[in-house]
């Protein structure tokens, strides 16, 4: 049998060369580079939280504008002139034996010294607040690092700043859990799981107490002006308490700066969460029909105080939030509603008796 004819093959066109992918050059890593290797951190924060953190970082970063430099230069020149004039007056009073003028110069020197000392103290406290943000960034790097040698010293510094004694049970458990073969990420992670929750629990209790006081005060107070003054005072006290728990001593300007940062963070990231949390609870339990208007306002004020405390924790904390250890507004919401219900029931049952 004859095979079928094959089709014609035309060799007129040139052959196409197969494209081969060029190999990349070989990369070698030394022993030192392998120890300091850190994987790239993926930012999984929501868009609103990213905007809030950007606003906080921008507020923490000092702004070096031309006008500020001119003002600082003018103040420095004025201070030097005052000191020079004071020295000249003191020398003239000493030469002429004008004891009254000499006493005035001494009093002025004491006042100026006290003013300079207070300015230096405020600057040091404000610098400490900024330094806490750098420590948080360093902790975030250590939590993604495989190097060895920095984690233990960093955690011991944090414990010393927070006033945790070496004989504290949580710190003793941390010392017993770490060993030389662990890297910085594991050591800092153990500190975050064993020691840091002790301070976080104290801060949570303070937030719960202050939020409950704000809720009950607004619910029973008939004067709006008194409510505003009370809430402002209690919120400042809450910020001071949380900062003290985390080892930060606030001055006048650093307190105002922290309060402004907290309000900025709430304005960017807290409004949607607050509306969602309150709306879900009110729609599910129909509290608007059972509670008075003052009680509803009290719950709102308590939730804002709790939100303020959570953000103050986030700014004063030396470690970033890990996993799900960040306090949730819903936990405080349920606690506030339960306390308010109990208080209203007691107030209704007391007149009947």
Swiss-Prot record:
GO terms for cellular component: plasma membrane. The keyword Transmembrane applies. InterPro entries: DUF697, UPF0283. Pfam families: DUF697. Residues 20-31 have a biased composition (Polar residues). Residues 16-35 are annotated as: Disordered. It is found in: Cell inner membrane. The chain crosses the membrane at residues 70-90, 100-120, 213-233. Keywords: Cell inner membrane, Cell membrane, Membrane, Transmembrane, Transmembrane helix. It is a multi-pass membrane protein. HAMAP family: UPF0283. Belongs to the UPF0283 family. This is UPF0283 membrane protein YcjF. It comes from Salmonella heidelberg (strain SL476).
């Amino acid at each position: 049998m004859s095979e079928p004819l094959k089709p014609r093959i035309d060799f007129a066109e040139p052959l196409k060369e197969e494209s081969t992918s060029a190999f990349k050059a070989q990369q070698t890593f030394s022993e030192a580079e392998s120890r300091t290797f850190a994987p790239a951190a993926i930012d999984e924060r929501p868009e609103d939280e990213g905007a809030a953190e950007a606003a906080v970082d921008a507020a923490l970063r000092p702004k070096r504008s031309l006008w500020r430099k001119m003002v600082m230069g003018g103040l420095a020149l004025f201070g030097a002139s005052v000191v020079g004039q004071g020295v000249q007056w003191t020398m003239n009073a000493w030469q002429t034996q004008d004891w009254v003028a000499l006493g005035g110069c001494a009093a002025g020197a004491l006042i100026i010294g006290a003013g300079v000392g207070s300015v230096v103290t405020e600057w040091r406290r404000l610098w400490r607040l900024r330094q806490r943000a750098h420590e948080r960034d360093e902790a975030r790097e250590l939590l993604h690092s495989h190097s060895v040698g920095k984690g233990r010293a960093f955690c011991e510094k944090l414990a010393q700043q927070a006033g945790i004694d070496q004989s504290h049970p949580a710190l003793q458990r941390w010392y017993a859990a770490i060993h030389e073969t662990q890297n910085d990420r594991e050591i800092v992670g153990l500190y975050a799981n064993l020691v840091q929750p002790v301070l976080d629990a104290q801060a949570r209790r303070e937030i719960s107490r202050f939020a409950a006081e704000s809720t009950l005060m607004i619910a029973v107070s008939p004067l709006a002006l008194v409510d505003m003054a009370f809430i402002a005072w209690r919120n400042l006290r809450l910020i001071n308490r949380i900062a003290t728990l985390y080892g930060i001593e606030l001055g006048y300007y650093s307190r105002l700066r922290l309060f402004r940062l907290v309000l900025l963070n709430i304005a960017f990231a807290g409004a949607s969460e607050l509306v969602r949390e309150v709306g879900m609870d009110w729609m599910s339990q129909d509290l608007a029909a059972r509670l008075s208007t003052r009680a509803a306002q009290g719950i709102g004020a308590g939730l804002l105080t709790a939100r303020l405390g959570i953000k103050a924790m986030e700014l004063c904390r030396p470690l970033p939030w890990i996993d799900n250890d960040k306090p949730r507004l819903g936990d405080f919401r349920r606690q506030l509603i339960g306390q308010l219900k109990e208080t209203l029931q007691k107030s209704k049952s007391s007149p009947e008796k």
